Amino acid sequence: MELTTPGVAATVAVLFGIVVTGAFHEDGLADTADAMGGWTPERRREILKDSRHGSYGVAAMCGTIVLRIACIAALAPAAAFAALVAAHTLGRGAAVGVMGLAPPVSTDGLGADYARSLTRSRTVTGVAGALAITALATGWWVGPFAVAALISAVMVAAVARRAFGGVSGDILGAVEQVAECAILVVATGLASRHPLWW
């Protein structure tokens, strides 16, 4: 017997993740989206440091929340659980990978502090750990999810390098959020074609 509807369950799952993390990554996504409205790298970096959220930031944050809820609600319970594990784990693994490999915007800030302490071996260990956890939850389907995380991380990092001159803590939050959304979209597509994809 189901206790509630898929939509309500998906909303609770997404909100629970936001509460547990303190909306840490959502805030980074919103700041990054706002900063993209600047005309020059210097202006974008200035906006990035502003903790207030503008229309771009709110739209990006709300859009990703709605997309995640819609994807999770479309999945069967077991598939939704596996997809959530993949999205949360590989999303953070993608952020670790970008943090360890991409140049920082500046030497100040939380992202720069973490990047200085993140050696190549720690980066590899973090990404490998994320892949291993996802493989335990999803089996061989870790492959498509890893590809989705990789493509989204490379795209966000490339845009950030061009727009800001590197990455920051906020941009790493954007990497994590975009990777989560990409993985959940892939999970929804797999579920529509392979009922036992997980």
Regions from the PLM with identified roles:
Residues M1-G22, A33-E46, D50-W198:
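Hydrophobic alpha-helical transmembrane segments
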